[in-house]
A protein has these predicted regions:
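N-terminal helix-rich structural modules
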Residues: 1-117
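A short, structure-level motif marking secondary-structure boundaries and short turns
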Residues: 34-35, 131-134, 176
């Protein structure tokens, strides 16, 4: 295992989380806009994760451990300023999942993010939009009747359970704004 790379990925993901939490708890994380502070963190992380993936490919469990693998996924998942890069990462993550190097739920989230950014219906129902009343609603879903089966296969909770959790987070966010 590459402990140095693992530590770097964990540090990058932690900075992302801490920045988001700080903005959220101070009421400075906008719902419909991109925080300039968060943007700076993402730009820095994007530049570095691109170099890491170019050098190592997808950073799977054997290379950086489960937590390092998840940290890399978080960084790519949050690379919303770089949709082409996210799209390029999908086949890399697909290969990692097939090899047992990454969990399917990570691929589900990334695929859905890429589909949403392309204006296409998502497969797993992981992406949400804000409604006019300030609540999150699932972004359009392909074959919605079977979404829970796909979610179950990926190790995700049902849409109902997930939407309930998201709405609880919305309430906390709305209290801060």
């Amino acid at each position: 295992m590459n402990e140095e790379l693992r530590a770097e990925l964990l540090s990058m993901a932690e900075e992302d989380r801490e920045t988001r939490d700080k903005l959220l708890h101070s009421g400075q994380l906008p719902k419909n806009n991109y925080s300039p502070v968060m943007k700076l963190v993402h730009e820095k992380n994007n530049a570095r994760i691109k170099k890491i993936i170019e050098q190592f490919g997808w950073t799977g469990k054997n290379l950086v451990g489960e937590d390092g693998c998840e940290a890399a996924w978080i960084i790519v998942q949050h690379a919303v300023l770089e949709p082409d890069f996210q799209r390029q990462c999908v086949p890399l993550l697909e290969s990692a999942v097939a090899a047992g190097e990454a969990p399917l739920w990570q691929l589900a989230y990334l695929k859905d993010r890429v589909l949403k950014m392309s204006g296409e219906p998502q497969l797993y129902g992981t992406q949400y939009d804000w409604s006019e009343n300030g609540k999150s609603v699932p972004y359009k879903i392909h074959d919605e009747a079977n979404v829970d089966a796909r979610r179950r296969e990926a190790g995700l909770p049902t849409m109902e359970e997930n939407t309930k959790r998201i709405h609880q987070e919305d309430e906390l966010l709305n209290e801060k704004l």
